[in-house]
Amino acid sequence: MKEDISKVVIYTDGACSGNPGPGGWGALLQFNEVNKEIFGHELETTNNRMEITAALEALKILKKPCHVEIYTDSKYLQQGITVWIHNWIKNNWCKSNNEPVKNADLWQNLYEELSKHTIIWKWVKGHASNSGNIAADKLAVQGRQTAIEILKCRG
């Protein structure tokens, strides 16, 4: 009997010039022998927002429930979504010191997307020898460069 749920491997990355500053995000999605590359940008953002956005946008591409392995070089993203988020939800999106969670809007949207899939989060060393991470980094840099070019045109 064939398994109904597809397996997808996703590599994500974010890039930012300045923090905050122009930024980009990128993701490589792999399903069977097919690779899909996506990227985007924001004119004023942070590296952490771009890391979360990369994972969020990659998951939004999926049309049906999947078994997903997400590879990220961001400890912030990996720890945030696997460890910290449970307390944030319990504390109404506040940290233990009662300060609001940064990027709560993105965390909430990402958490909602997670409920549609079975997900394993894996951390990889950035700028190393992992070809998927290298591809995601190039896409994020491409997104960041787009933001920089737009800002140059605006003067």
UniProtKB/Swiss-Prot annotation:
GO CC: one term?
cytoplasm
EC annotation? 3.1.26.4
Catalytic activity from the UniProt record: Endonucleolytic cleavage to 5'-phosphomonoester
Q: Which CDD domains match?
A: RNase_HI_prokaryote_like
**Gene Ontology biological process terms in this record:** DNA replication, removal of RNA primer
Q: Which cofactor does it need?
A: Mg(2+)
Q: Which residues bind Mg(2+) 1?
A: D13, E51, D73
Checking Gene3D superfamilies in the record gives: Ribonuclease H-like superfamily/Ribonuclease H (3.30.420.10)
- Subcellular location as annotated: Cytoplasm
Q: Which UniProt keywords apply?
A: Cytoplasm, Endonuclease, Hydrolase, Magnesium, Metal-binding, Nuclease
Ranges annotated as spanning the membrane = none
* Similarity-based family: Belongs to the RNase H family.
Assembly and binders = Monomer.
Tell me the protein's name: Ribonuclease H
Q: Which organism is it from?
A: Rickettsia bellii (strain RML369-C)
